[in-house]
Amino acid sequence: MAADATGASAATGAAKTPGAADAPGAAGGTGAAGAAGAAGGAGGAGGAGGAGGAGAAGAGLHSRHRAVLPDWLALYYDRPIEITHGEGRHVWDAEGNRYLDFFGGILTTMTAHALPEVTKAVSEQAARVIHSSTLYLNRPMVELAERIAALSGIPDARVFFTTSGTEANDTALLLATAYRGSNQILAMRNSYHGRSFSTVSVTGNRGWSPTALSPLQTLYVHGGVRHRGPYAGLTDERFTEACVADLEDLLGHVRPPAALIAEPVQGVGGFTAPPDGLYAAFREVLARHGVLWISDEVQTGWGRTGDHFWGWQAHDRNGPPDLLTFAKGIGNGMSIGGVVARAEVMNCLDANSISTFGGSPVTMAAGLANLSYLLEHDLQGNARRVGGLLIERLRAIGAGAAAVREVRGRGLMIGIELVRPGSGEAAPEAVSAVLEAARGGGLLLGKGGGHNTSVLRIAPPLSLTVAEAEEGASILERALHCA
């Protein structure tokens, strides 16, 4: 099995958590509600170890779904499940089956399902006022912006709230192109940045980029995928040197671009990452050309990688990015996204703007409560500790599975790449089979990867306990026999 793509073990090294409180004790003691105590959790019909498929009610809802929603709207499983409620790290479907959630609604339920602190904040704010728009002063929005600006690491930071990661990246691209007077963008191969007209055009993954039409001119560079491509066989140092040389050569052939947009760890691309320091080396080159750096932290932010609060901190030798985008986990399920940028860049637009739904009082209240819980309970530290143990356990499992090419990741952002044994070819059919088998065993996973969707993605809530990590690994070990 190939070596870890990220280098050093995820379980080692001091965490960089700006402003976080000390950990409250053992990894399991995160204080989340309900099922936080043990792997068994609250008992629901079906149990975690033997979830059944969708019944007649589920089949009927699936038929209605297909009748009124787009064909291109992806659904997991041959018989899709309807999730009706959740608690801690578990969710239940309409048939009463309980599942251990190792994907968190695409890395969005970051803290825990039904976290009392968040539901209380949402309920209390909704009872006062749900909506006002950005035309009026909004105390929760200002307070959350202040906290995020302080945590961002960007000097003289300004924050603009959106409702999704797509919209956040779209806004960052608008700011960068306006500031630089250029519609040319550098992006990474195998990347994903959203589903809007501008963000699909900077997405370097054809499975998620349905059109080549674009308001931007996009140039793709090497570096996001460590163990595939022309530089895969190089050492980390030589890999970085080759990618920097490629960037230098590219910039010598084009007019100066507006920005480079990059995920520190590629999310939809299969949780793959370059060697630490690559984007710092890129930044040195970009700075000479006046090109901005946008760090897409939609999936990597808020301590998920364990070692760092932001993904860009693994590449911080030459300072923070010019712009940072975020979404998903900060709302713990509420629709929050946003952009952080230094004031000079954020204030470059010469026209008025508003946001009708971005920064709504209810979502901001959720974000404040969730961020406070995250920091007070040191969930970044929990991600580092429990994630490190989980990665080691999965590597041990993978060492005995011919279909496993690589187990990679940091913290609670883990990818398992599957191949056809003996060939090294991507095995999307094996990923689908394991996904189904894991669901049957009571475990929800994600999938991704630019090479024909050949990666299992593991990203549970950051309050995951050691017992739950072991439970999930055991279910996955059995499911891998289907690969």
Located regions from the model:
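Small-residue-biased low-complexity repeat regions
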Residues: M1-A56
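Conserved N-terminal phosphate-binding loop of PLP-dependent enzymes in the Aspartate aminotransferase
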Residues: A2-A3, G55-A483
